[in-house]
Amino acid sequence: MTAAPSPRCDRITELTTDQLRARLPEALQIYVTAMGYPPTTAQQRAPMWSAHMLRAGWRCIGAFSDHNELIGIGYGYLGAPGQWWHEQVRRGLLASGGDSGGWLDDYFELTELHVYPGSQGAGLGEEILRRLLAEAPGSKVLLSTPEGPTRAWRLYRRVGFADVLRNYRFTGDPRPFAVLGRPLPLEPADSAPAESSGRNYRARNTDG
């Protein structure tokens, strides 16, 4: 039996809140497939993703196949006191003696970044990341990603993300996470081929 060809990217574009709402089932399907989560996770995450669209500075980038299927998604917004992720990171930085005021001021939170597994391996994750951050508000960007030698780590290091907090455990998740950050804007991409996208491109897995 011949395998179906992998979807190829035809266009990458910014999405409005209305456009993402219309594509939310597709976006969440990419999320659970790329992360290997149970299908029921999509339904649980839908209200959270919808709430994030209302936050200041929210912007979203989508990648589409030549059949107009969503195959990649990335979004984020301005971090602020009172947000669950902000308070978790602040607590971790204070406990570790880190500079919470320096990082947690005027920053863009890279919340989600995912590529459909069949479309990984051609640098699509990096392209979405760069498009998302090209006009992101804030003087810096922060994200969290599970600890471990993943493609996500190679991507983030390649574009200049540095350690902010390591081996941190967010409330409700036993896995160790790293919080990474860097100033904005990004430098232009060099001429080296982009590494493949990976299932752990996801910036983090829990927020309120």
Label each PLM-derived region with a short phrase.
Residues 31, 156, 161:
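Conserved active-site tyrosine of GNAT-family acetyltransferases
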